[in-house]
């Protein structure tokens, strides 16, 4: 099963990037074919219809294909002002924008339709980003994704990782593994392998 894991942050010491690395490792242990994506590796401007009218940026086209090729995604989202960050919204806005005149990418939801998505978050606060999840999940549903019922929010993230950026708490690791397992299980049933590799 092809699984895409990414964090909604580009900060060097981001808790959610650390969480994404841990999640990717747990998924590989469970037999998934994991792509750990760093959004900072792609040059994606703020969405602007005037920019789009000139031509969809090349890195947006690359991301469309990457997201499409994976049957399942796991998103590790920060929480900014009780919601998800602009990086996540901007990425999904670009990916869901049809490419006029392109027979493949003229469908808004080609990249996302039927994808199974697991949602994780990490935050220095006690709630661990739960409010971010509560805003992100409706967006994913609007993109015709199936969101795994199991989620996990890592609170007090500033002290949750050791010097090697590994989680200190086995219980947290088990909760993340539960999200991974449910996401992979659902994807194996809801997203035919052929559709994820065309």
Kindly label every feature range from the protein language model.
Residues 1-32:
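N-terminal beta1-alpha1 ligand-phosphate binding loop
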Residues 1-4, 146-198:
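Glycine-rich phosphate/pyrophosphate-binding loop and the adjoining helix
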Residues 8, 39, 122:
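Cofactor-binding loop segments of dinucleotide-utilizing enzymes, especially the Rossmann-like FAD-
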Residues 16, 20, 60, 88, ...:
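A general structural signal for well-ordered alpha-helical segments in protein cores
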Residues 30-35, 145:
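A generic structural motif
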Residues 39-57, 160-164:
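N-terminal beta-loop-helix "entrance" segment that forms/cooperates
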Residues 56-143:
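Helix-loop-strand module that forms the ligand-binding subsite of alpha/beta enzymes
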């Amino acid at each position: 099963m092809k699984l895409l894991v990414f964090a909604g942050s580009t900060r060097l010491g981001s808790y959610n990037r650390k969480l994404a690395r841990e999640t990717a490792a747990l998924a590989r242990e469970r037999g998934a074919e994991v792509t750990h994506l760093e959004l900072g590796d792609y040059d994606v401007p703020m969405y602007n219809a005037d920019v789009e009218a000139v031509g969809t940026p090349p890195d947006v086209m690359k991301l469309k294909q990457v997201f499409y090729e994976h049957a399942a995604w796991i998103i590790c989202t920060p929480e900014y002002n009780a919601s998800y960050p602009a990086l996540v919204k901007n990425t999904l806005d670009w990916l869901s924008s049809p490419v006029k005149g392109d027979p493949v990418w003229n469908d808004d939801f080609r990249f996302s339709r039927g994808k199974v998505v697991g949602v994780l978050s990490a935050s220095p606060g006690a709630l661990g980003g739960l409010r971010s999840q509560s805003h992100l999940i409706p967006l994913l549903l609007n993109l015709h994704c199936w969101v795994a019922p199991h989620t996990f929010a890592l609170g007090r993230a500033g002290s949750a990782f050791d010097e090697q950026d590994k989680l200190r708490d086995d219980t947290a690791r088990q909760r993340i593994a539960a999200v991974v397992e449910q996401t992979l299980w659902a994807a194996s049933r809801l997203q035919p392998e052929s559709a994820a590799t065309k």
